[in-house]
Amino acid sequence: MRKLLYIGLLGLVGILGFTSCRPSTPYVYRGLPKEYILAWEEIYGYAYDSVPGPVVALDLYSKGLELDANHRMRGTGYNLYISDIFVPESHGNDTLRLVAGKYHSERTGLPFSFLPGKNWDGQPTGMYVLYVEEGKLQSIQMLDSGYIVVKDTTSVMKDLEFTLYYRSAYGSRITYKPHFQGVLYPWEKR
């Protein structure tokens, strides 16, 4: 009887020892964030010969994720990136930046449009969401279509309402509606 008790205790200690030696599990995906708290507007100016107006990109960060002085991601959170946003020429001023209006996802290069997300040989382009954990990329969610409503709330503040779409792993279409309100920090990329 004691022999069975010792074997049972030994087995229990072995199981506890094994489970405590496992590496920590990565973040369990619970859905994309509804709010972004930091945003950079990358200003490319007149970047394409075939496109008449200026081009910008949006680089937004959720709580917990930030950029260091070298513009490298630190922390844990989400990064919504939308490249190739085609803004109208000047609008009566000298700006090359995002102006108020409704921008649609399409491949035309016309003002008030932006490119949809696409995976080019493992490289995300257009619009996508990165999940970063402790500065390391964990996942990429491509966004295939949608629109952005940009409002000026003050001379420096913007209100961005996104309605973006993507396909789930099972093929169903998912609507993603994040929001940002604040300053779009300019980052000259020309």
Language model feature labels by segment:
Residues 149-190:
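C-terminal or internal capping secondary-structure element at the end of a domain, subdomain, or sheet
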